[in-house]
C-alpha cells in the first residue's frame, strides 16, 4: 500500500500567523525520510494554506512523487500544467467549506472536467478524480479518460468516529449522524460495502484506485481490507499526531499501519 502524506495542515499552521514557521520544506524532508511514498498537497483557489511558491519548491525538492490536488478552475489548471507534478487529482472546491465535503460530480461538470483532463494530458500529467464511491462514478471516470480514482472516504470516517470515538459528545458532532448505535453500525457497514464495490469495479475497468479523507490511525485498518485500493492519502490525522509525537514518528507509525 502506498502512503501519500498530505502536508497541507503544516501550511495551515504557518498561515495562521503569516510566518515561515513551520517550514513546509522541513515537513517535506521529514515526511520523505520517514516513509512517505508520495507527498500530496492541495493548491486551493483561495490559497488558504499551500501557496504557489510552495508548489514550486516542493516539486523542486521532493525525493518522492508529488500528487497535486486542484479544482477545475482554469487559472489553477494552468499552474498545475506548468509545474508538471507526478499526478494531478481533481477535487471539488467551495470557498466556504472547512475541508473538501464530497466527491467531484462527474456528471454535472462533465464538460469542465473533460477540458481539465485534456489540458493536463497535453502536459503529460496523469489524472486522478476524487469521487464518491459509486459504480456510476467509476464508469464515468473511465469514460472521461482518467487514469485513477481516489475514493472519498469521508462518509465512512464520520460514521466510524460517531460510533467509535468521543466525537458525538464534542462541539464537532456530525448532526446528521446523531443516530442510535445500531443505525450507525448499519450505515458504517453500508459505507464500507460501497467503497469495496466501487474499488472492485474501478479495478476491473483498468483504473488505479486510491482512497482518502478522514482516514486516521484508528479507522485505516478497515480500508486496508479492500485489496483493490493501492494508495491512501492521509494528512490531518498525521499532522495532529505530530503535535504530540513529532512528525517523523507520526509518519512512521502510519506507514507501519498501512504496510500490514
Where are the language model's segments positioned?
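Alpha-helix-loop-beta-strand connector modules within alpha/beta enzyme cores
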Residues: 48-74, 108-128, 173-210, 254-259
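Histidine/lysine/aspartate-rich catalytic loop segments that bind and position anionic ligands
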Residues: 132-192, 198-201
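Glycine-rich phosphate-binding active-site loops on the catalytic face of alpha/beta enzymes
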Residues: 90-97, 148-161, 228-247
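Catalytic cores of alpha/beta
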Residues: 73-84, 134-144, 211, 215-229
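C-terminal helical cap(s) of enzyme catalytic domains, especially alpha/beta-barrels
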Residues: 59, 102, 163-176, 184, ...
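Hydrophobic faces of well-ordered beta-strands that scaffold small-molecule active sites
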Residues: 3-7, 39-41, 66-68, 88-90, ...
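Conserved N-terminal beta1-alpha1 strand-loop-helix module at the mouth
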Residues: 1-69, 74-75, 79-85, 143, ...
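Active-site mouth loops of central-metabolism enzymes
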Residues: 6-24, 65-72, 99-107, 124-133, ...
Amino acid at each position: 500500500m502506498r502512503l501519500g502524506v498530505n502536508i497541507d495542515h503544516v501550511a495551515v499552521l504557518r498561515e495562521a500567523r503569516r510566518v515561515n514557521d513551520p517550514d513546509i520544506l522541513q515537513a517535506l524532508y521529514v515526511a520523505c525520510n520517514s516513509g512517505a511514498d508520495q507527498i500530496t498537497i492541495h493548491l486551493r483557489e483561495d490559497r488558504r494554506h499551500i501557496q504557489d511558491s510552495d508548489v514550486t519548491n516542493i516539486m523542486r525538492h521532493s525525493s518522492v512523487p508529488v500528487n497535486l490536488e486542484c479544482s477545475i478552475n482554469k487559472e489553477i489548471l494552468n499552474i498545475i500544467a506548468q509545474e508538471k507534478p507526478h499526478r494531478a487529482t481533481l477535487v471539488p472546491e467551495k470557498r466556504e467549506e472547512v475541508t473538501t465535503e464530497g466527491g467531484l460530480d462527474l456528471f454535472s461538470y462533465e464538460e469542465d472536467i473533460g477540458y481539465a483532463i485534456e489540458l493536463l494530458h497535453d502536459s503529460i500529467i496523469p489524472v486522478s478524480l476524487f469521487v464518491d464511491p459509486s459504480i456510476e462514478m467509476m464508469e464515468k471516470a473511465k469514460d472521461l479518460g482518467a487514469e485513477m480514482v481516489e475514493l472519498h472516504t469521508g462518509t465512512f470516517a464520520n460514521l466510524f468516529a460517531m460510533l467509535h470515538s468521543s466525537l458525538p459528545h464534542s462541539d464537532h458532532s456530525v448532526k446528521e449522524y446523531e443516530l442510535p448505535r445500531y443505525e450507525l453500525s448499519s450505515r458504517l457497514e453500508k459505507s464500507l460495502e460501497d467503497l469495496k464495490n466501487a474499488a472492485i469495479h474501478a479495478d476491473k475497468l483498468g483504473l488505479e484506485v486510491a482512497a482518502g479523507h478522514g482516514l486516521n490511525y484508528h479507522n485505516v485498518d478497515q480500508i486496508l481490507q479492500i485489496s483493490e485500493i493501492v494508495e491512501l492519502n492521509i494528512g490531518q490525522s498525521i499532522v495532529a499526531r505530530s503535535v504530540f509525537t513529532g512528525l517523523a514518528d507520526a509518519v512512521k507509525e502510519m506507514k507501519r499501519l498501512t504496510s500490514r
